Amino acid sequence: MCTAVNTVFAENNNRGDTVNIKIDGSKANTSENFLYRGQGMISCNGSSRLLLDYKEKNPESYNKILEHLYGKNGLKFTHFKVEMGADVNTSSGTEPATMRYEDEKADVTRGAGFQLAADIKKINPDVTLDMLWWSEPKWVSDSSDVYAARYKWYKQTLDAAYETYGLVFDYVSANQNERTVDTDWIIYLSKTLKSEKDCPYDYSEIKIVAADECGTWGISRLMMKNKELCDAVDVIGTHYTSHSDDNTKKLAEEKGKEIWFSEGSSPMNYAQSAYRFDEGKSGLTGLNGVLDIANRMITMVSGGYMTLYEYQPAVAGYYDGVTYCHKQLINACTPWNGYYTLDSGYYMNLHFSQFMDKGWSFIFDACYGDAKVGGDGHALVDAKYSYITACSAEGDYSTIITNTTSEPITYNFEIANLAKADNEVYVWETRGPDEGQEYNANYFKKISTVTPENGKYSVTIKPYSMITVSTVNITDYASDAPAESENTLLALPYSDDFGYSDEFLSSRGNAPLYTTDEGGAFEVAEKNGENVLMQKITKDIKANEWGGTPDPTTNFGDDRWYNYSVSADILTDGEDSYAGIGLRYILADSGRSGYSVTLYENGNWIFFGGKKKVLDGNIADFDSSKWHNVKISALNNDITISVDGKKIIGYKAEEGGYSAGRAALYSSYNNCCFDNVKVEATDSVQPYVNKFDNFDNIFTYSENGWEHSTMDSFKNYKRTISHGTEGAYFTVDFEGTGIILTGVQKGDTVVSIEVDGKTVNKEYVISKISNRQSFLLINGLEQGKHTLKLAVVSGNCSVDAAQVLYDYEAVNKAVTNETSSVAESTDSSDSVPEDNDKSAKSNGGGSGKGSFPFVPVAVGAAAVTAAIGAGVAIAKMKKKKD
C-alpha cells in the first residue's frame, strides 16, 4: 500500500553506467496536492480551429482524435483549458471573444474551445476544465471599473458555457497569460466567485489557478507575503520550466498548494526524417525533441513538485506556417479528407498515460533528474539519469526512464512494501529506427517481461531512448490513424458562397468552413438579405494586444495548391477601408504572405509580394458602394490581377518567388464583406505540388560541407534546414514534371545545376531571399523519375524543402474504378455550383458549404507514364557577374 508522506528525492545512486533504484511503497507521498494529475491540453491561439471542420466533414476522424487524447486507450488526458479569446492574435492565430460588447449575450459557440470541452466530456466526464485570458475585450479594459467588468465577462462566459453545453468549470486561471501578476484582481476574482449567488452551479467551488508566468515564480513570493492572496490561490501554475523555487515548494509542503506545469511544449522535431541527421540517428533527440519534452515531464516532479503537464498545443488543428508551428502530438490540418497523424510525441506520452493513472502517488526516493536548463531557456540539456516512479493504492508501480546519452545504462531495481513487489514487470520502449526500418518502427513496443527475484531485477535502457518499467500489463498498441495515401487533395475548383444553413452557423459561431483567422474575425453575416463573409472587428472594439496582431487576415485551403486563381466579390466599408485577396499563402507570422492585392474604397490598389509593396495604382471612377469582383492568378512565376474583369497587373516574379500555398482574404478593421469566393486551377496539368522536407529521403547530401539543423525556426518547413558551403552538393530524386527548391538565402551564391546527369547551368546565381521563398524552379520535364543535382560553386546555399510538380491529369486517369465510383456518388453538396460568369456579386447559387468535387488524389510520387513536353525550363537563370 502507498501510505506514508515523503518528499525526499532520490540521491544520485549512480555508479558509472549503472543506477540503483529502490522503490519503497512506504515512502510514497499520498498528500492530495502531490498526487499525479496526468496531462492536459490547452485550446488557444487558433490551434483547434480546424477541428470544427473535422467534426463537420469527417466526424469519425474528429471522434478518433479526441479518443486518442482523452480515451482510455489513448493519452488519457485529465484536464482541458480553453482560451477566453479577445479577437487578437495570441501567437498562432486569434480566438474570438465571447462578448465583444458589454451588452452582448456571451456566445461560447465562437471558436472551438468550449465545443471541444463539451465533446471531451462525453468521452471522459471526469475531465477537469479551466479557462485563461491572453487579452480581454475592449469594453473591459476601457471600463471605469475594470475588475467589475472583467468579472462580468468571466461570469457570463461561465453562465453561457453551462447554458449552451452543460459545462461545469472546476478551475479558472485568474492572471493574464504570461504578464505581470495582478494580486488585487486574483483576490477580487476569488472573493467574488465565492460569494456569487446568481449562478447555475456553485461557483464558490471553482478553484483559482495563478499566475501563468513564463518561467518565473513571482506569484509564490507574493503569496508568502500576503495571506489573503495565499488563501485565494489553490493552484500555482507556471510555464516552460521544470524547476520551481523554494517559496513554491514551501507552499506545496506547508500550505497544500498544487503545483502545475500549466503550459508546456509538445515536441517540435520532425522525427519522420530528422533521424537521418540528429544525435544518435533516432529522430528523438535535440532541443525541443521528444526526449527533451519527456525529461521536462520527469524533472518537473523532482525539480518542481509539479503534478500536471499541459500541452500547448496537443493538436495542431491549424495550417502549417503559423507562429511556433510544427509543435504537436497530433497533426490535423486537412479536415476535408479526415487525415491526421500521430506524431512521435504522442507515443512518448503513452509511456506516462498508459502506466500511471490520475491519483497515483509518487515515490520520491525513486524520482531523479540531473538535466540542466539550456538552449532556448525552455529546454533541458545534459541529462544522463532521468526517471520518475509512482504507485497505486493496489500496489502497482511504474518507472519511466530516459537515456539521452550515447551509451546504454543499466538500472538495478529493488522493490519493497508494495503488494505487487514480486509480480512480473513489463518493459515498453520507444527509440529510433535500426538500419532499413521505418522511422517509427520502434515506437512504444513491449520489448521484455521480467520476473523479479526476491524483489530485485535489472533493466538496461539503450542510448537515445525511453522506457517504462511497470507491473501494469496492457495489450500491444496498434494505431488506427489514417494511412498516408488518405491525405487527399482539396481538389480544384473550390468555391464558397457562404449560403450555409442557420443550424450550421449557430453551431460554430458563424464560422465558415476551412478559414483560420490571423487577425480580426471573419464570420458569415447577413447583408441585404444574403449571407456573406464579413470582417467583424472594428477599430473601436479592437482589444489591446497580447503580442502582435496583423490587420484582419484569414486563410484557407490546401498547402499543395500551386497554379491557381482566387477570385471574390468584395465590398469595402467606409473611408480608408480596404478588402483584398491572395494566394500562395505560406507563413502567417506577420499577416501577409504569398501574393496579394488590396482594393481601397477610393479605388486605390496595392499589390504585395509577401509583406513588400510591389506595385500600386488607382481605378478611375471607382464606386465603393457597389460590389466588385477581384481576381488574382498564378501560373508558375507569372501573376495577373483583374478587377471587374479588367486586367490591372501582369507581373513576373524574378527574385524569390512564392510557390505552393493557401488562399487568403484581407481586410481593414472595418466590416468589409466577401462573397462568391472561387479557387480555380490555372493549369490543368500542374495545379498542385507534392511537398518534401529537405530531410526526406529524396534528398542525398555530400559527406562534407553541410550543416544540418534538425531544430530551427518555425519559419522553416518542418523546422529543418541544411546549409552548404563551397564544394558541397546534394541530389534530389523525384517523380514528376518539375521541381521547386525553397529556403532562406544570404545572397551572392553561385551553384551549378544538373538534371538527369546533364548540366543545365554551371553558374546559377541565387539572390538574397526570405524563409520559404523559392530559389529554383525547373519545369517542362517529361512525367517520370528524375534526378536534380545542385553543387555550391561559391558562397553559401541553404535548402529547406522541395516541391515536386507532376502531371495531375495523368494521375487522375490512373485512379481506380472503385475511386471513380466514389467520386460519382458524392453528395451534391460537395459539387461545384454553376459559374454564372458574373463579374460582380451573384444573386444566390452554389451550395454555401465550401464545395469542391471530391477527387481522391494520393500524395507522394505517383507512378504514372504520361509525358508532357520534352524541354527543360529554369526560371530566373543568370550568368555569374564579371
Named regions from a protein language model:
Residues 609-629:
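Short, aromatic/His-centered strand-loop micro-motif at the edge of beta-sheets
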Residues 13-169, 174, 183, 187, ...:
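N-terminal catalytic cores of secreted or lumenal carbohydrate-active enzymes
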Residues 261-378:
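Aromatic/acidic polysaccharide-binding cleft in carbohydrate-active enzymes
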Residues 538-606:
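Secretory/extracellular carbohydrate-interaction modules
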Residues 401-520, 524, 540-544, 613, ...:
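C-terminal beta-sandwich/jelly-roll accessory domains of carbohydrate-active enzymes
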Residues 651-675, 769-771:
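Flexible glycan-contacting loops in extracellular carbohydrate-active proteins
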Residues 464, 671-818, 822:
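Glycan-recognition surfaces in beta-rich domains, encompassing non-catalytic CBMs
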Residues 370-423, 464, 728, 737:
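Carbohydrate-binding surface patches
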